[in-house]
A protein has these predicted regions:
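Gly/Pro-rich hinge or "lid" segments in bacterial periplasmic/extracellular proteins
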Residues: 65, 154-215, 219, 346-347, ...
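N-terminal lobe/hinge region of extracytoplasmic solute-binding protein
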Residues: 28-77, 108, 183-189
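Ligand-site clamp/hinge motif
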Residues: 178, 207-253, 296, 384, ...
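Extracytoplasmic/peripheral linker and loop segments enriched in polar/acidic and small residues
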Residues: 297-300, 304, 312, 389-404, ...
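Structural transition elements
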Residues: 304, 321-355, 372-376
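Surface-exposed binding/hinge segments that line
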Residues: 75, 119-168
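Long beta-strand-rich cores associated with HINT superfamily self-processing modules
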Residues: 443, 499-523
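Alpha-helical secondary-structure segments
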Residues: 100-106, 132-138, 188-189, 217-219, ...
């Protein structure tokens, strides 16, 4: 570690080591939330914080089973109508009662096109108030994933939003701010008391929460720390209690540190490269008059040039699983028999490029975040070097995740690295978000590479309403194989995500990378 990095680490550790009560959880990771608006950005770190303050009608248990939350019961009135009985006596953090009006309002808000959370109400046509403690969801068709999706349909106070003129979802991609992007009004187990972007979020336990946590955490302090050495130094010095972004080079050392422990676990997140497949010409390339990535042979060449095993061995130090599929183990639809990527083959890649009309390669740009995924910028550096061996001269543009994602949502990236976690643990979520042709609704709502494949579209549309499990899983399998074989994106690997913490911290590792303070105990 350089003197400059060591000094920065010591300074941050000293600031974090201010006296904390025994029931304060000091948690750090490399990436900050994007917003406090629960309907704006489908971003795992943001959702991990938001789930402490906002709640859905249902939630996941410690074992990812759907269980009651703001709804106590649901009944399938018909194939396209589900009645939810709401929990009585629940109050928002300002003391106002939770009612059906808040559910109806939040549904209208999350569906607004400037947000990216509409995927969680996919298939829902309307939410109708029956009475103050009952709502009906009217579906477009039978929706097998309804309950698993509704975990992330966060309910906001209607009266609070109206009072503060924040009934519209924040337009994050255009850098808009609204009252809800900086303030919170939910019913959850914790109140967000302060947020200083890129510095700190503080949360305090909600004494009026309707449920009782299994843990004893009364306060949460979340600190985004981009620098790997600084983040690790904060844990070693006692400045933080838990890290959920471990630098791969430090995992072995931290295992041997007295007073610390490693909580091992995989993550349902796949790291991949997306290419602009829909523009007439691709910006950032020296190919004019056509889309260089539209030729499948070019996509195959770019994929074959990447040595995933080398990235796993060196950059990731074993903390990844090389991938051919766009979903990870633990996601419904994953099949290890389909997930073995072809070995890197530069000679074959060069031949494919020559056959496609690029015997000397071409120039392009690769956009990459540098504070979001494990070793994200280093992975992009690896890929750029591997592409250079086949004559593809890629310029790397790496930046903080906030401007990266804003540019991505404005279709400014010709090729980019992204990681995709599966919040509902079902491959439809991935296929519908990333590969389905983009519409004004949930379909393709994260398809910023302009992928459009009629076969995948047909399969996704069918699986959204298919209630026969075997038939639906066959559709998922076919769509995943089609995505793989047509190289609609280039999967690199599935992340392995151990967490490190002090010995006195007990919590549950979450494959969705969303720690929950309600499951955490500090002794």
């Amino acid at each position: 570690m350089s003197f400059k990095a060591l000094f920065a680490a010591a300074a941050l550790a000293a600031s974090l080591a201010a006296p904390a009560q025994a029931q304060t959880l000091r948690w750090a990771a490399q990436n900050d939330v994007l917003t406090l608006d629960p309907h704006s950005q489908n971003h795992a770190t943001t959702n991990a914080i938001m789930q402490h303050a906002y709640e859905g009608l249902v939630r996941f248990s410690a074992t990812y089973q759907v269980e009651p939350a703001l709804a106590t019961k649901w009944t399938q009135v018909s194939p396209t109508q589900v009645r939810f009985e709401l929990r009585k006596g629940v109050k928002f953090h300002d003391g106002t009662p939770f009612t059906a009006d808040d559910v109806v309002f939040s549904f209208g808000r999350i569906k607004q096109p400037q947000g990216t959370m509409g995927i969680y109400v996919t298939g829902v046509k309307e939410v109708r108030k029956v009475d103050d403690s009952t709502v009906d969801m009217i579906l477009e068709a039978p929706t097998p994933l309804l309950l698993r999706n509704l975990v992330n349909f966060f309910v906001m106070s209607k009266s609070w939003a109206e009072k503060n003129k924040t009934t519209n979802t924040q337009d994050f991609k255009n850098k808009e701010e609204n009252f809800a992007s900086r303030n919170v009004m939910g019913t959850g187990p914790y109140r967000i008391t302060a947020w200083t972007p890129e510095q700190r979020i503080t949360m305090s336990a909600n004494a009026d929460w309707w449920d009782k946590p299994t843990g004893n955490v009364k306060e949460v302090i979340y600190t985004p720390i981009k620098s790997d050495p600084t983040r690790v130094a904060a844990l070693l010095s006692g400045g933080v209690d838990m890290l959920t972004d471990l630098p791969t080079q430090d995992v072995g050392r931290l295992r041997g540190e007295s007073g610390l422990k490693i909580l091992d676990g995989s993550e349902v997140r796949t790291i991949f490269i997306a290419l602009d497949l829909g523009s007439p010409e691709v910006k950032g390339t020296n190919v004019t008059g056509k889309n260089v990535f539209a030729d499948k042979r070019v996509r195959q060449a770019l994929s074959l040039a990447i040595d995933r095993q080398a990235i796993q061995r060196t950059t990731m130090r074993g903390m990844s699983v090389p991938a051919a599929l766009l979903v990870a183990p633990g996601v419904n639809g994953h099949d290890p028999a389909l997930d073995a990527p072809a070995a890197a083959n530069a000679d074959q890649a060069r031949k494919l490029l020559a056959d496609a009309g690029y015997p000397n390669g071409f120039e392009m740009r690769l956009n990459c975040p540098n504070n979001r995924y494990v070793n994200d910028e280093e992975i992009c550096q690896n890929v750029v070097a591997m592409w250079a061996r086949i004559g593809v001269k890629a310029t790397l543009a790496a930046e903080n995740f906030t401007p990266f994602i804003q540019k991505m949502q404005n279709f400014d990236h010709p090729a980019y690295l992204l990681g995709w976690g599966v919040a509902n643990f079902d491959a439809q979520y991935t296929l519908q978000s990333l590969i389905r042709t983009r519409t004004s609704g949930a379909d393709g709502n994260f398809n910023y590479s302009r992928v459009s494949d009629a076969t995948v579209d047909r399969l996704v549309d069918a699986m959204k309403t298919e209630t026969d499990v075997a038939k639906r899983n066959a559709m998922i399998r076919e769509a995943l194989v089609r995505t793989r074989d047509e190289v609609l994106v280039i999967p690199l690997h599935h992340q392995v995500r151990p967490w490190a913490m002090k010995q006195n911290v007990t919590t549950i590792h979450r494959a969705d990378d969303r720690p929950e303070a309600r499951f955490t105990t500090i002794r």
